[in-house]
Curated annotation (Swiss-Prot):
Molecular function as annotated in GO: GTP binding; ribosome binding
Subunit text: Associates with the 50S ribosomal subunit.
Species of the source: Corynebacterium efficiens (strain DSM 44549 / YS-314 / AJ 12310 / JCM 11189 / NBRC 100395)
Binding, GTP 1: 96-103, 143-147, 205-208
Domain EngA-type G: 90-253, 263-436
The protein's name: GTPase Der
The keyword Iron-sulfur is annotated on this UniProt entry: no
HAMAP family, alphabetized: GTPase_Der (MF_00195)
Annotated function: GTPase that plays an essential role in the late steps of ribosome biogenesis.
């Protein structure tokens, strides 16, 4: 068999570059994103890797090693484990009518721009929780859409979300507009808040100059105590409000909140593919505003949800627009944050509309997930709309457009009817178990000997590269590092990945296979 020719004609199906995994630094092992040989001078740390190529090339290499010896080598490569923490945190809900500056205030409280801010009402449509830290105390800050008692349609749903936030918070911050004064909606909301069984803090926002002190007097008529003059845009007065929030928190929150414990799931896909409907089906409540208009969800919406087997932290994203560069304003920031959501997630559920052809948008989101090295489950939603002709077309699309991810679990669901939703959790658990999984160095090198014996590496530059040794450098995603005497072609790395999956499985997670070229040393330890 002409191994070199067979691999030379093979197309590149899946990128192995794009080191988006934050736990892995390719430069630590002397190779770059394209797996090029390391021609740089070795530093002092390379003294730990003085390999005798003749020993490593022996057929029985490593067979007499104990697991302790393998583990010692792995520790020298800096493999780390990440712990998951649990803690109970209080929640403060930021409420008020539309366009009084709630999201700007949230960004001040959390010290970063996460809540979408635009100078027109209705940008925030869901209630979204952000983690904040003030004076050494951590707590949740919950942003809400604008509340209005007389609205209909999607705006009524937004108002309902604000009411749900008020019902679950430990402290409520009621935001009014100093420049506008008290409106009828403010008065109605104040009467509602006076009946709340938790502390309410009145914040008069847009207090931009001392000349507005006279305007503060009217807010006492709301009956909610002294108003705090604040300019969220300029950062004025926010510290006093945060101090008051901490002072008002109860000793124990209403409900236990888990910060690091649940595994993080990103629900991603193009707009109107059913992400919010799926989240609501899992949560059993109206957690995310749903409407037939594409792009209803603007902010990422986090929900802690108990499914059959585990607690999960679901993140419902805004969906990617056709081209980020053509998006404007709040949609531009929401699209950028979708990328950030993928980076911060552990497993991504990619929702694809099964009733429509797979689009370039679907492919682009998929590429973002695999480049980020995240565990993956592909869910084909709206299966209740499928007919036989469309199923035949979809089978052809899968063969052509998703052939590079045969390792990803595919599930046909309907968020509307609940079809097959019970299959999603086992698929996510399996994907995460493999994403976290590490193969012992002994098992890895036993497999490697067999794979190379069956198909040796192709010639390169008239020389046959020799694979000396392999180790799994990290997890999340699994990264296999091969120490060799020469560069390995991309086709041969794909062959090794296929053989690796045949032996060890690893369904649901991408695998990185990297090459560390060991230069031959002459007498005196100098490179040749």
């Amino acid at each position: 068999m002409d191994v070199e020719g067979a691999f030379a004609d093979e197309e590149e199906l899946a990128p192995h570059g794009g080191w988006a995994s934050k736990d892995f630094d390719p430069s630590e092992f002397g190779y770059d994103d394209d797996f090029a040989p390391d021609d740089s001078d070795e530093d002092e740390d390379d003294d730990d890797y003085e390999f005798d190529e003749d020993d490593f090339a022996a057929p029985d290499f490593g067979e007499d090693y104990t697991e302790e010896e393998w583990e010692e080598l792995e520790r020298s490569l800096g493999i780390e484990r990440r712990e998951h923490l649990e803690e109970s945190l209080c929640t403060v809900a930021i409420v008020g009518r539309p366009n009084v500056g709630k999201s700007t205030l949230v960004n001040r409280f959390i010290g970063r721009r996460e809540a979408v801010v635009e100078d027109f009402p209705g940008v925030t449509r869901d209630r979204i929780s952000y983690l904040s830290d003030w004076g050494g105390q951590r707590f949740w800050v919950q942003d809400t859409g604008g509340w209005d008692p007389n609205v209909k349609g999607i705006h009524a749903s937004i108002a309902h979300q604000a009411e749900l936030a008020m019902a679950s918070a430990d402290v409520i911050v009621f935001v009014v507009d100093t420049k506008v004064g008290i409106t009828e909606t403010d008065a109605v909301m104040a009467r509602k808040l006076k009946r709340a069984d938790v502390p309410v803090i009145l914040v008069a926002n847009k207090f931009d100059s001392d000349s507005q002190w006279a305007d503060m007097a009217e807010f006492y008529a709301l009956g909610l105590g002294d108003p705090f003059p604040v300019s969220a845009q300029h950062g004025r007065g926010g510290a006093d409000v945060l101090d008051k929030i901490l002072e008002s928190f109860p000793e124990e929150p209403r409900a236990k909140s888990i910060v690091e414990g649940p595994r993080r799931v990103a629900l991603v896909g193009k707009p109107n593919v059913g992400k919010s409907s799926l989240l609501n089906k899992f949560a059993g409540e109206e957690r995310s505003v749903v409407d037939n208009v594409a792009g209803t969800t603007v902010d990422p919406v986090d929900s802690i949800i108990q499914l059959d087997q585990k607690m999960w932290k679901f993140i419902d994203t805004a969906g990617l627009r056709k081209k980020v560069k053509t998006a404007t304003g709040h949609e531009f920031y929401a699209s950028l944050r979708t990328r950030s959501v993928i980076d911060s997630a552990e497993v991504c559920v990619l929702l694809i509309d099964s009733s429509e052809p797979i689009t370039e948008q679907d492919q682009r989101v998929l590429a973002m997930i695999t480049d980020a090295g995240k565990a993956l489950v592909v869910a084909f939603n709206k299966w209740d709309l499928m007919d036989e002709d469309r199923r035949w077309e979809l089978d052809r699309e899968l063969d052509l457009q998703l052939a590079h991810i045969p390792w990803a679990k595919r599930i046909n669901i309907s968020a509307k009817t609940g079809r097959a939703l019970q299959r999603l959790e086992p698929a996510m658990i399996e994907a995460l178990e493999n994403w976290d999984r590490r193969v012992s160095t002994g098992q890895l090198n036993n497999w490697l000997r067999e794979a190379i014996a069956a198909n040796p590496p192709p010639m390169r530059g008239g020389r046959l590269p020799r694979v000396l040794f392999a180790t799994q450098a990290s997890t999340r995603p699994p990264v296999i590092v091969l120490f060799t005497t020469g560069f390995l072609e991309a086709g041969y790395r794909r062959y090794l990945e296929r053989k690796f999956r045949e032996r060890f499985g690893f369904n649901g997670t991408p695998i990185r296979i990297a090459v560390r070229v060991r230069e031959r040393r002459g007498k005196g330890g100098k490179k040749q």
